[in-house]
Amino acid sequence: MTYRFVEEEFKNNFSWKSTDVTSADSLRIAHTQDQRFKLFPYKANGKSPIVTDTKEVVGDFIKTALKAESKDTDFSKLIKKVENEVAIEQENMNSLFSIIRMMFYNEGKFISDNIGMYAYKGSSDNKSVERLAIFLNDVLKVDQDIVHAITEAQKKYPYNALEELVIQCLDAVPSKDNQTEPGYYVVFEDAGKQFKKDFIFMLNSGMTGSDDFADLLALYYLYYTSQTCIVLDHFGSGNRDERTPLYFALDWEKVSANRECCKGGWKILQENVKHIFSHAVTLELLNQTDDSDEMLDYIRFSELVENGTIDDLETAAEIRKIEKIYTDAVGDYKNFYQIPAMNGKNETDVAIRRLFSCVHTQFINKRKSANDKYVNKLIEFYRSRWLKNRKKSGLVFNLTERDIIFLTKLSIQNEERIRLIDLFKEYEKRGVYLDNSSKILLQEFFTKLNMLDKKSDSGDAQYVKRIL
């Protein structure tokens, strides 16, 4: 295998303009991303809505998993179908229409908020919601085992007569899977492995309400994206399966600046998050090749170099070619020469780090607005769902009582109880770390709820009981 950058692909996909058309001292490309390499489901513009509530995503997530499409959910069209199905007096028919409107519509939008109805959700007006649903399906690796569990849960749902009538009239059918473009690239593998276990447990145990599913998606949206941001900043030295601890505080506890939740949580991650648009563009640049079937990220480049599939020096030379063409096209920034020398795992990794630095440097100096609009799509989700302002200590990842109960249910699953120290390990498998002060307060919380079997003062002999 030989890695080759295709200049014509770059020029076409990045809307390159020659100096015959525009000044050499101007920006002569569009900073394209999400075409040849799909990293995050965001757009670098202010028109694209920010999704902060994962409850909006639940229906589209299930629909995407099942590859299901509903027919038109417009109320006026639905009641015409109902009228053809039901033989009753017109006066009673009008009452039936009113009941359908009350039960299944809110502000003109069809409501699908249980496992029996999710697949019949109409098309969303918010394309950001649809993109996020597809992204989560891809990066959390929804497979046939999960699809089977969803369909089994649907079969067990006790549909009432009115729901059955509406479903019959909406007539949702599976769509043909004719997707030709690649899905989102999975940078961090561990999130999908744990998600599968938790999602199937919830489906099998009846935790299928929209609030529970929203909590699950919020947790794994956080887990995947936070770890991915960190892995990306390690370039070719990143590890797809290695978690970086990110510490949380309990909602009701007081914190100080020297606590892990302040030093080792959002304070660490926020710097990584600021780089995601530059990573998206860099990876798009690296994938301007004649092979559109395989996406290559930083780790994959290093793997191919290490196993001898691609030549290190030749590949590094190709990437330096990308840098030259790219920096030449960004004619309104003149200080690329000030970027310091890089170190890396191999010559290819060094060249990639240098290319990224070129992309990021011009964003923070010339095009900060575009960068911020992209990055804020993720930051605003964190801020709305997971961060709490601790005044002098700043923003800190936060767990509410509801979050704790939910995490504990996922951790214990079908067991009757779990050792307290093992419970903390289960939290960590889902990306949630607590320091010793938080662990002591959490132990007190479980005691107040009568959830703790205290066999001795030793943590090894304390068990948290299953939540019914």
Language model features with spans:
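Charged, amphipathic alpha-helical stretches
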Residues: M1-G108
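Long, internal scaffold/assembly segments composed of regular secondary structure
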Residues: M207-Q338
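Short acidic, hydrophobic short linear motifs in intrinsically disordered regions
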Residues: E416-R430
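Long, mid-chain structured domain cores
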Residues: K77-A257
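Charged low-complexity interaction tracts in eukaryotic proteins
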Residues: N376-D403, E444-L468
